[in-house]
């Protein structure tokens, strides 16, 4: 027999409906704010987003201070005047209830988790919730607006029922005085909270300016601009928000010189000749230039702004000559960039002129070096760079004293290319060394990788992130990797390097007693039971370990018991073990073990939910 609801729950449901659909002529809401703490908290936890929004927005000012968190740290008995009070905790719960995928474990999110916890007082969960909701509304409306038969106003597009229901609203013709079924209504009601927005080309219009008039956009992402009509609409949107926009991105766009000129004029702040954009990105787009080897002078002026901190031209079809021109412009302008991303552009040879100038003119070289002193991140992924490019790059790197991240993934630099960079590590070990290096899929062999690892170990180089993934290094690399684990390395990606069971056995033998790793990816190495036994040892030695990726390693069924036994004796902070793709492991057969680990505060373990039907992993090329 189903348990009858309590009187408290029945009252909470009644109040929820009143908050959603009532007009409060009788002042009932005032009585809600006077409820005892226990009853108010019970109500708060049962309210959907729209009701919570109404309850919070109508709260009298004199009552607001009563809903902050109390300081339970023991250092003082006072109330903490912080934003993560009872309402914010409720918003946070609603946010992750609706978008659980945003709480997934990933390397990037776990890297910043500690910082986020320390700065949680800066996070406005109500703003995050409605910003994401409005984005969902625009995405849903775009599907309708892109239909050939569409001819009405964008703001009048009716949103899917699932979106309306997600905020707690249900159609009640007789007792509701507001229609939440159109895009226009959601923008008017919640547009105020939007700081970041992604727009498809169907929204590049004057009407969109009316829809987002209340928003104070700091980040604007524009997709699929391809016509003059789109250009005109984009310029109107930019003009409306130019005083607030800091991050501007174009994706899958065709960018003409005339648009660049119009954009620059639109974004210029009154009384100056400059814009205030801090982050400018062009992704998977194309510049429509009469001369493919050139770029619009206005664009070069735009990227030379002293306010610009990040420049990303990823998969923008710029080519070697344009890359040279961009780099030369940044140097001549003494740009204060912290991030330069030229990935996926096929720019082999882009630094050849720079190297020649450096070699021949010492004084010019010293002047040039001043222009690169602020660069912290350099992304050259997927640019078809070769050994000769690494020779040129080494000269440039020598004049980037604060560079922290270098991404060379997906470039066929081979062993000789890595050897060209080794002198750079020797020269920088004592001052401002590189901390993040990505050499994923660089066609390295055992010789090149071992040479690099040996140098880093000998120098005690303070590197925190290294990826050697997708390089055919073989099991012989294991001793060098084991020695490398003695260093300060925190994030190691050695996915699909051909370790095999022999490699994992050697890695286990050479692993130090104390390992500093926070993240490791050993997936796709066909390690079998030896991979599980390596993890058993690693878990006991790496007290700071948060994430382990060990999928597709052909682990036998007994591997899960080996790993779980290590968790019983753990003293660390492990949060995730990913064993997906090991088809002989089955979560349903070990449900009790996995449940016990979770009950004891253990990590999340990702395994196959059911036995695989002979779907063996095949890593043949």
Please place each PLM-identified region on the residue numbering:
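Solenoidal tandem-repeat scaffolds enriched in leucines and small polar residues
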Residues: 251, 255-415, 420-429, 435-436, ...
């Amino acid at each position: 027999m189903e348990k009858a609801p309590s009187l408290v729950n029945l009252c909470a449901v009644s109040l929820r409906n009143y908050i959603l659909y009532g007009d409060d002529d009788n002042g009932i809401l005032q009585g809600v704010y006077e409820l005892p703490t226990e009853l108010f908290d019970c109500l708060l936890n049962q309210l959907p987003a729209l009701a919570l929004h109404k309850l919070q927005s109508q709260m009298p000012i004199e009552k607001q201070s009563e809903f902050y968190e109390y300081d339970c740290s023991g250092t003082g008995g006072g109330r903490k005047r912080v934003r993560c009070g009872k309402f914010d905790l409720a918003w946070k719960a609603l946010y992750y209830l609706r978008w659980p995928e945003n709480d997934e474990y990933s390397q990037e999110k776990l890297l910043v988790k500690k910082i986020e916890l320390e700065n949680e007082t800066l996070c406005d969960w109500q703003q995050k919730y409605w910003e994401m909701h409005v984005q969902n509304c625009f995405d849903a409306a775009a599907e309708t607006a892109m239909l050939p038969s569409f001819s009405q106003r964008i703001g009048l597009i009716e949103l899917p029922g699932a979106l309306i229901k997600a905020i707690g609203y249900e159609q009640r013709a007789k007792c509701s005085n507001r229609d939440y079924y159109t895009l226009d209504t959601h923008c008017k009601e919640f547009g105020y909270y939007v700081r970041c927005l992604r727009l498809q080309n169907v929204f590049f219009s004057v009407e969109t300016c009316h829809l987002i008039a209340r928003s104070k956009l700091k980040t604007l992402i524009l997709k699929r601009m391809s016509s003059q009509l789109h250009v005109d609409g984009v310029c109107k949107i930019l003009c409306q928000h130019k005083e607030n926009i800091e991050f501007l991105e174009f994706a899958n766009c065709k960018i003409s010189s005339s648009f660049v000129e119009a954009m620059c004029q639109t974004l210029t702040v009154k009384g100056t000749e400059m814009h205030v954009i801090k982050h400018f990105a062009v992704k998977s787009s194309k510049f429509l230039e009469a001369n493919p080897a050139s770029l619009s002078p206005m664009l070069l002026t735009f990227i030379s702004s002293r306010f610009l901190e990040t420049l990303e031209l990823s998969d923008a079809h710029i080519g070697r000559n344009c890359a040279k021109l961009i780099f030369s412009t940044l140097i001549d302008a003494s740009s204060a960039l912290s991030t330069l991303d030229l990935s996926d552009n096929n720019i082999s040879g882009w630094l050849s002129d720079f190297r020649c100038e450096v070699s021949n003119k010492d004084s010019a070289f010293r002047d040039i070096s001043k222009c690169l002193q602020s660069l912290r991140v350099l992304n050259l992924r997927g640019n078809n760079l070769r050994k000769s490019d690494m020779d040129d790059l080494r000269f440039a790197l020598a004049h980037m004293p604060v560079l922290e991240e270098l991404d060379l993934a997906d470039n066929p630099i081979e062993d000789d290319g890595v050897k060209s960079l080794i002198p750079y590590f020797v020269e920088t070990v004592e001052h401002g060394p590189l901390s993040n290096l990505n050499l994923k899929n660089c066609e390295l062999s055992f010789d090149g990788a071992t040479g690099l690892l040996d140098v880093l170990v000998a120098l005690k180089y303070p590197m925190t992130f290294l990826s050697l993934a997708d390089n055919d290094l073989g099991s012989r690399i294991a001793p060098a990797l084991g020695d490398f684990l003695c260093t300060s390395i925190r994030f190691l990606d050695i996915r699909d390097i051909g370790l095999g069971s022999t490699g994992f056995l050697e890695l286990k033998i050479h692993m130090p007693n104390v390992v500093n790793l926070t993240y490791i990816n050993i997936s796709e190495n066909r390690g079998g039971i030896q991979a599980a036994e390596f993890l058993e040892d690693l878990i006991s030695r790496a007290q700071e370990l948060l994430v382990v990726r060990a999928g597709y390693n052909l682990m036998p069924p007994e591997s899960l018991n080996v790993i779980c036994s290590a968790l019983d004796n753990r003293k660390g902070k492990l949060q995730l073990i990913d064993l997906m793709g090991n088809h002989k492991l089955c979560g349903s057969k070990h449900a009790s073990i996995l449940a016990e680990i979770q009950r004891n505060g253990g990590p999340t373990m990702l395994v196959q939910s059911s036995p695989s039907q002979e779907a063996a992993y095949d890593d043949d090329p």
